[in-house]
A protein has these predicted regions:
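Extended, compositionally biased flexible segments
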Residues: 52-135, 141-142
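Conserved small/polar residues in nucleotide/adenosyl-binding loops
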Residues: 206-213
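Buried, small/hydrophobic-residue-enriched core segments of structured protein domains
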Residues: 2-69, 148, 156, 160
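Catalytic-core "active-site belt" of small-molecule-metabolizing enzymes
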Residues: 29, 33, 37, 142-205
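Short, flexible micro-motifs
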Residues: 112, 181, 212
Length: 217
């Protein structure tokens, strides 16, 4: 995938995971074998296995493979693989601007920004969406017309916690059921998997001077 860093330099990054998934999604036999693995029950079972102490051995291997500096986090040893992915970063590594007129970033990731209008589309991991097709709520989609969609894509090396972007109150939350394809965009080059994936979002009413937001998709 291509990225642009903060200095405007273009970075092309292809991982071993990208290569493996491209093989899986471009061959009929492997796609058929993969179907049972996409079921929510299988995903839940995998989650339980990655909560075991035995799975903790993969945390250090993963950190080294992806150049993750564990000294930036509050602890360097983990009880499980999932414990590693929910690790908490040291406060000084993510200073927060608390001015009422500022929206902070909700998470680490690669950022794209799109205007929201009636016939407009924006892209999430190579998949085109309208506001309505993403959140499946026509009334709420109309509310955001004229605004901006800020899409932040986390990759495996990013910090996997997120926060609200300003002070306020969560007023609405919705889960859209679906299946559990990989979130790697390589797979989406073969078929539009993200429109089939389960997802969840919430609406936040802010008490600061910042605009209201749709969060967590």
């Amino acid at each position: 995938m291509d990225y642009m860093d903060r200095e405007g330099h273009r970075i092309k990054k292809t991982t071993s995971q990208d290569k493996f998934l491209k093989f899986v999604y471009t061959h009929t036999a492997t796609r058929v074998l993969m179907r049972p693995l996409l079921l929510p029950a299988v995903s839940r079972l995998g989650g339980k296995l990655l909560n075991t102490k035995v799975s903790a051995v993969f945390a250090g291997l993963f950190a080294r493979a992806h150049g993750i500096d564990l000294n930036k986090y509050e602890k360097q040893k983990f009880d499980s693989y999932n414990d590693f992915f929910t690790r908490k970063i040291k406060a000084e590594e993510r200073p927060v601007n608390r001015e009422d007129t500022v929206l902070i970033s909700p998470c680490d990731g690669k950022v794209s920004v799109y205007p929201i209008h009636e016939n407009g589309r924006f892209f999430i991991k190579h998949t085109p969406y309208t506001t309505h097709s993403l959140i499946r709520d026509a009334k709420l989609a109309r509310h955001y017309m004229g605004g901006w969609a800020v899409v932040i894509r986390l990759t495996v090396d990013d910090y996997h916690r997120y926060c609200y972007v300003a002070d306020g109150e969560k007023t609405y939350q919705r889960r859209i059921p679906g299946i559990f394809h990989t979130v790697n965009p390589i797979a989406n080059d073969i078929c539009p998997i993200y429109k089939m994936n389960s997802r969840e979002y919430c609406c936040l009413l802010y008490t600061s001077d910042a605009a209201d937001e749709l969060d967590g998709v």
